[in-house]
Amino acid sequence: MIKKIALGGILFLLLAFIGLHFYFYFAAKKAFEDVKEESSALLLGNPQGDFLVVSFVDYQCPHCPTLDRILEKTLPSEPEVKILLRPVAWMGQTSEDIAALVLGAREQGKAAALHKQIMEEPKPPSYARAKELATNLGIDVKKAEDRALAAGLRPLIQKNSTIAVDIGLRSVPSLVIGGMPYAPPPEGIPGVNGLRLLFDEARTKALSPSPKTE
């Protein structure tokens, strides 16, 4: 009797493990499709580019501006790169407020400029400072806030966090380079040459034939 109970427990745990494995597999597969969607992202680089780089940033992250500047410096040498910047709000309400403001300003054609200004701040800005930067750029802040509300951008920003986690990314800044997740190592963020090497690695991996199964 005890042996049967033990075997039943082992079988239950095995089935649970298999179930979790498939759950995470399909969640990751869906996330890699969702990451290409543009409604919750800011489009940078070449809009028609055939090599997609997704950048996850948090506007309260002190390290995100460093990778953002390196990405910007990389673009002149990588004209085929299309960047989708996906803001997350892992560091609190201010992160979400600023992300909603930036995405809400897209229709005014100045969201990229606002993002750049925020990234150039000496420290992560308050929401009041972000609104000041937006106003200085000629952005109608009220209109951007209303647009964020009407378009349901805040839930989409929260979804960006889910996408990142399902892909396997747990920190910012982080990237998806041609379908390859990348989080900078503890020793530091790579420079322009290091980033271009990662681009080449992702291209090579994409061109490599999948191993045949017998």
Question: Predicted segment positions?
Answer:
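C-terminal cap of thioredoxin/glutaredoxin-like
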Residues: 1-16, 135-214
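Membrane-interface motif at the C-terminal end of an N-terminal transmembrane signal
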Residues: 17-31
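Short, flexible loop segments at the rims of nucleotide/cofactor-binding pockets, characterized by
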Residues: 31-32, 62, 152-153
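A short beta-strand-turn-helix
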Residues: 34-51, 75-76
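A generic local structural motif
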Residues: 37-42, 69-71, 161-162
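Structural alpha/beta surface segment adjacent to cysteine/selenocysteine redox centers
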Residues: 52-59, 65-135, 140, 170, ...
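Secondary-structure boundary/capping motif
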Residues: 63, 93-94, 156, 184
